[in-house]
Regions:
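N-terminal Rossmann-like FAD-binding beta1-loop-alpha1 element of flavoenzymes
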Residues: 6-39, 43
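Short hydrophobic core segments
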Residues: 16, 144, 158, 166-178, ...
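Short beta-strand to alpha-helix junction loop
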Residues: 62-63, 109-128, 180, 226, ...
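FAD/FMN-dependent oxidoreductases across multiple families
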Residues: 116, 255-291
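A conserved short coil-to-beta-strand element within the FAD-binding core of flavoproteins
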Residues: 140-154
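Central beta-strand plus flanking loop segment that forms part of the substrate or channel wall
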Residues: 186-219
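Active-site substrate-recognition segment that forms the wall
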Residues: 223-254
Length: 291
């Protein structure tokens, strides 16, 4: 678990947010700064449990080949730890039943694998490895109230909700869509960063289920996507630890899957390929659907 880091430069860095972006940023900064402090307003469970500050935690997550390789370089041994905890390898062509553009995609050995797991499992394993570094501290239940610095000149740290100030040579905001950095910067006399907004009218609902997929006969991926523009629905299923599957159903331009069990099943029944609907019928739900 212990990792060696090269000699750091003088100064501290502060990272706001202990999600995947914040954890990865902190790992890189640990090689360049004497001390890195990661702050998150959530409690951070020691076990793979969902938390309020990660709204996507209840939806599917996978590591594609290059992303996994990068994380493995940053956190040696991460892949083996995830697999030992139940993450599932799948060949993206051989182990996938994909209906798209009017037919099934051919299945064959590709040698291209992705690793499927729940977001809480991935985040927990990465955070544990980050916390093993001697110059990194992760502080849970710690809300940031604003930035500190010389107005119009520079940012030199953060102020916490309780009034404590943490000086920093670099502040990284990885707090996600709830970021307040634009307002904090304006309060210090800086212009807010330019913002680009792309409206995507896509909606999706996810249900976690437990059991086997008889159609695949093992871990694999199911995808059913209708042909645009006349049809707007899609569905996907991915295996994760604990003999469970994330099943996501969605649509575009106002077409969305219901969260109740009957409506969710009916939406799956209307997809062009029956594999996802069959998976739902042959498994048991774990908790409620999340939109």
């Amino acid at each position: 678990m212990q990792q060696q880091t090269p000699a750091a430069t003088a100064g501290d860095a502060v990272v706001i947010g202990a999600g995947m972006a914040g954890l990865a940023a902190a790992r890189v900064l640990a090689d360049r700064f004497a001390r890195v402090t990661v702050l998150d307003r959530d409690s951070l469970p020691a076990t793979p449990d969902s938390r309020r500050g990660v709204p996507q935690g209840a939806h599917p997550h996978v590591l594609l080949a290059v992303g996994r390789e990068v994380l493995e370089r940053l956190f040696p041994g991460l892949t083996a730890e995830l697999v030992e905890a139940g993450a599932r390898w799948i060949d993206v062509v051989r182990d996938a039943i994909v209906w798209q553009l009017g037919g099934h995609r051919a299945r064959a050995e590709s040698g291209i694998e992705m690793l499927c797991m729940s977001r809480p499992l991935l985040e927990t394993c990465v955070r544990r490895r980050l916390q093993a570094l001697p110059n990194v501290e992760v502080r849970a239940e710690t809300a940031v109230a604003g930035l500190t610095g010389r107005p119009g000149e520079r940012v030199d740290g953060v102020e916490l909700a309780g009034g404590e100030r943490l000086p920093a040579a670099l502040v990284v905001d990885a707090s996600g869509r709830g970021s307040r950095s634009d307002g904090w910067l304006r309060e210090l006399g800086f212009p807010a960063p330019p913002e680009s907004v792309v409206t995507v009218r896509m909606h999706y609902t996810t249900r976690l289920v437990r059991g086997r997929c008889d159609r695949l006969g093992g871990p694999g991926m199911l995808v059913a996507a209708e042909s645009p523009p006349d049809h707007r629905r899609y569905g996907a299923a991915f295996p994760v630890e604990g003999d469970r599957w994330f099943v996501t159903l969605g649509g575009y331009h106002g077409d969305r899957a219901p969260t109740d069990a009957e409506g969710f099943q009916r939406f799956a029944d209307e997809l062009p390929d029956p594999a996802i609907a069959e998976l739902l019928r042959g498994t048991e739900p774990v908790g409620e659907a999340v939109a």
